[in-house]
C-alpha cells in the first residue's frame, strides 16, 4: 500500500513539473509558498485580528489552532515519520525553493494554512470572505507541490491535521 502511495505521489509531482510549470507560475508559487515560512503570514493576520473586537475571537482561535497544528506536524509527526523531501528521492524532480527541514511528512505550511483559514472562515460573515479563507489554504497546499518540496500525501495529511485543529 505504501509503495503504491509513493508511486502516485512521485507521478503527480513529475506531472506538475512537466505540464504546469511555466515562468509566470514559477514566480507566483515560489513567492506565495514563502509567505508560509514560520507561519508568519497567518500569525501576522491572526495577531492583527486580535486588535479589533469584531475579529478578536477568530484571531484568537486561529492562533490556538495553528499552535496545535505546529505541535502535531512540526514537533511530533515530522520527526516520528522522518520522510525525506521529494527532490531527494524523485528522479528528475527539480525544487524551486530551498527547504532546510529534511522531513517532509506532513506539510506544516499546509497545516497552518488550513488551521488558520478554516478558523477564519467559521467566523467570516460574508460568503466571498469564507471562500477567500479556504482558497488561500488550498493555494498554499498546491504551492508546496508546485515548488517540489512536498509529496501530495504530505499536503493531504497537513490539510487534515489543520482542519482537525
Give a label for each model feature.
Residues 1-40, 74-102:
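N-terminal transmembrane-helix/juxtamembrane module of multi-pass inner/ER membrane proteins
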Residues 22, 38-39, 66, 70, ...:
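Transmembrane alpha-helical core positions of polytopic small-molecule transporters
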Residues 22-26, 49, 53-61, 96, ...:
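Juxtamembrane/transmembrane-helix boundary motifs in multi-pass membrane proteins
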Residues 45, 94-165:
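Membrane-embedded catalytic cores of phosphoryl/pyrophosphoryl-handling enzymes
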Residues 45-71, 130:
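Interfacial segments of alpha-helical transmembrane regions
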Residues 54, 82-87, 149-153:
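Transmembrane helix-loop junctions in multipass membrane proteins, especially transporters and channels
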Residues 64-80, 129-143:
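Small-polar-interrupted transmembrane alpha-helices in polytopic inner-membrane proteins
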Amino acid at each position: 500500500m505504501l509503495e503504491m502511495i509513493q508511486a502516485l505521489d512521485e507521478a503527480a509531482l513529475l506531472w506538475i513539473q512537466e505540464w504546469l510549470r511555466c515562468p509566470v507560475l514559477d514566480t507566483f508559487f515560489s513567492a506565495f509558498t514563502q509567505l508560509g515560512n514560520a507561519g508568519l503570514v497567518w500569525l501576522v493576520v491572526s495577531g492583527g485580528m486580535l486588535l479589533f473586537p469584531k475579529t478578536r475571537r477568530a484571531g484568537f482561535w486561529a492562533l490556538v489552532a495553528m499552535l496545535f497544528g505546529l505541535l502535531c506536524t512540526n514537533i511530533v509527526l515530522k520527526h516520528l515519520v522522518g520522510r525525506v523531501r521529494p527532490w531527494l528521492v524523485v528522479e528528475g524532480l527539480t525544487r524551486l525553493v530551498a527547504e532546510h527541514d529534511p522531513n517532509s511528512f506532513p506539510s506544516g505550511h499546509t497545516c497552518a494554512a488550513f488551521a488558520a483559514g478554516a478558523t477564519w472562515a467559521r467566523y467570516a460573515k460574508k460568503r466571498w470572505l469564507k471562500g477567500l479563507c479556504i482558497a488561500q489554504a488550498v493555494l498554499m497546499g498546491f504551492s508546496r507541490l508546485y515548488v517540489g518540496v512536498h509529496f501530495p500525501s504530505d499536503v493531504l495529511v497537513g490539510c487534515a491535521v489543520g482542519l482537525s485543529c
